[in-house]
Structures are given as structure tokens and as C-alpha cells.
Amino acid sequence: GFQDGIDAFAYTGNCDYSHKFESNFVNVNITFSNSIMLSSLVGLRLGVWIAHGEGKFNFPYYKDKYNIAMSYSFDDYPGNPNGSDWSVAAICSNDGRHLAMMPHLERAFLPWQWPYYPEGRKDDEVAPWIEAFVNAFNWIKNNR
């Protein structure tokens, strides 16, 4: 899915750092970008599921040429499970409408989907990732 839709300049189909399928819950940082989906989450550090074996981003140009929307919170394995340049987990198009990511935020939008959820937030009905889907819905509704 994801691998077919991203420009070849950033994704090479390289195996993850471990050279095996990875399924884990890792932390990511949402960075400022043009991403419509992640706009209300900028500055947050959230847990998210990863599940891939070929998810390594390789970038031939300098970092400032890309709209990096999300990065793994750690540079090294296992915190950066695929070994992507600059620990990149997601990039977006210049207009922010297209978001290419390896983590599976759709698997972490409910608190019970998290292996650890903050003690002080036990009453949450949904996890913060739901905002990404709300942002996308609202953008579509307002830009028909």
C-alpha cells in the first residue's frame, strides 16, 4: 500500500534495520509540517504501532527539501525500527494533502489499543490519534 504511493526519491524498498518483519509500539514526535491530518498534533510525542519489514526512508537531498511530518523519538534501533534517515516516520506533500507514513495510527486511536496508556487519562474514550482522522474529515467537508 504505502510503498506504492510514495515518490521513488524517498522510499527505496530497503529492508528495515533488523532485516526482518517488525511489529512493535514505539514513540514518535509530531513535527511542524504542512500535514492536514497531523496539524493539531504538532509538538506531541505519542505511542504508535509499527508493522513492516520494508519501511526504510532514504533521502538523497538535504533534510530541508522534505516536509517531515513525524519522526521516531529515538535515532537508533529499536526506537527507529526501520533505520530511516533522520529517523523519519512520515513525510507529506507540499500542500499537506498527502501523508506517507510507516506507523499505523489507525491501530492506536482507542486507549485499549495501547500497551501503556498514561495513568491520568484513564477516562479517555479515544486516544489523541483520533484527531488525525477528524482533521482529515473536516478538511474534506470544508473543501468539497
Put a short name on every predicted segment.
Residues Q3-R144:
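Amide-donor transfer/coupling interface in amidating biosynthetic enzymes
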